[in-house]
C-alpha cells in the first residue's frame, strides 16, 4: 500500500477536485503550516468550533448525543479548557478516490503543546469536510488557530480497488458539511 507523493496529490486535486480549496505549496511563514507537502497535505481548521462543557449534561453518550453539552464559537482562534475537548472542521472539502484510504495525523506543533488531533480514516469514495476532534491534555487552556494547519492527510493507495466503497455502503457521514456530530443509526 504505497504512500502517494506530492505530484500525485497535486494532479488529483487539480484534475479530480480531490481537495478544494487546494494549496499547491507549503505555507509556513508566520502560521502553523498548511498546504501540499512531500507525501501528504496539511489541512486547515475553519473558524467554527464546538467546545464541550459540563453545565447541562453529566455524561457523553454517543448513542444519545445531547447538543446542549456544546458551546459554539466562531473566531480567529478557539480556547479549549484544561483537560477538555473541542470539535472543528477542515476548510478543505475532500473527495477520496475509490482505490485510496486517507490517514490523518495531528501536527507536531500542536502535539508538542499537549493538543491531540484525532480523525478516523477517510474511506474510499467518502467526501465532505472533515470533522476534527481536538483533545487538550494539559492542565492549562490551549489555543487552536483558525485558518491554519492542524493535521496532515496521508494518501495510501490499495493494491486493488475495494469491493464496497463508503459511497456504495451509503455511509452516514457522506457529504458532511461543517462540524458533524455523532450519528448512530
UniProtKB/Swiss-Prot annotation:
Keywords attached to this entry: Hydrolase, Nucleotide metabolism, Nucleotide-binding
Family: Belongs to the dCTP deaminase family.
GO molecular function per UniProt: dCTP deaminase activity; nucleotide binding
Pathway connected to this protein: Pyrimidine metabolism; dUMP biosynthesis; dUMP from dCTP (dUTP route): step 1/2
Catalysed reaction equations from the record: dCTP + H2O + H(+) = dUTP + NH4(+)
Lineage, uppermost ranks: Bacteria, Pseudomonadati, Pseudomonadota, Alphaproteobacteria, Rickettsiales
Oligomeric form and interacting partners: Homotrimer.
Active site, renumbered: 133 (proton donor/acceptor)
Keyword Phosphoprotein attributed: no
Pfam families from the UniProt entry: DCD
Enzyme Commission number(s) from the entry: 3.5.4.13
EC class name: hydrolase
Function: Catalyzes the deamination of dCTP to dUTP.
InterPro entries: dCTP_deaminase, dUTPase-like_sf, dUTPase_trimeric
Residues at which dCTP binds: 107-112, 131-133, 152, 166, 176
Gene3D superfamilies attached to this UniProt entry: 2.70.40.10
Gene Ontology BP annotations: dUMP biosynthetic process; dUTP biosynthetic process
Name the record gives this protein: dCTP deaminase
Amino acid at each position: 500500500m504505497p504512500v502517494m507523493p506530492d505530484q500525485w496529490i497535486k494532479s488529483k486535486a487539480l484534475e479530480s477536485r480531490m481537495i478544494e480549496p487546494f494549496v499547491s505549496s507549503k505555507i509556513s511563514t508566520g502560521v502553523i503550516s498548511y498546504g501540499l507537502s512531500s507525501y501528504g497535505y496539511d489541512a486547515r481548521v475553519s473558524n467554527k468550533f464546538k467546545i464541550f462543557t459540563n453545565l447541562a449534561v453529566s455524561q457523553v453518550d454517543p448513542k444519545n448525543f445531547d447538543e446542549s453539552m456544546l458551546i459554539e464559537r466562531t473566531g480567529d482562534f478557539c480556547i479549549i479548557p484544561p483537560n477538555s475537548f473541542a470539535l472543528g472542521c477542515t476548510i478543505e472539502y475532500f473527495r477520496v478516490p475509490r482505490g485510496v484510504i486517507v490517514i490523518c495525523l495531528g501536527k507536531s506543533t500542536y502535539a508538542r503543546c499537549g493538543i491531540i488531533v484525532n480523525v478516523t480514516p477517510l474511506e474510499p469514495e467518502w467526501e465532505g469536510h472533515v470533522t476534527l476532534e481536538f483533545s487538550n491534555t494539559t492542565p492549562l487552556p490551549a489555543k487552536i488557530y483558525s485558518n491554519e494547519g492542524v493535521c496532515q492527510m496521508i494518501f495510501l493507495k490499495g493494491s486493488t480497488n475495494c469491493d464496497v466503497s463508503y459511497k456504495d455502503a451509503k455511509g452516514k457521514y457522506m457529504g458532511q458539511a461543517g462540524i458533524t456530530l455523532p450519528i448512530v443509526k
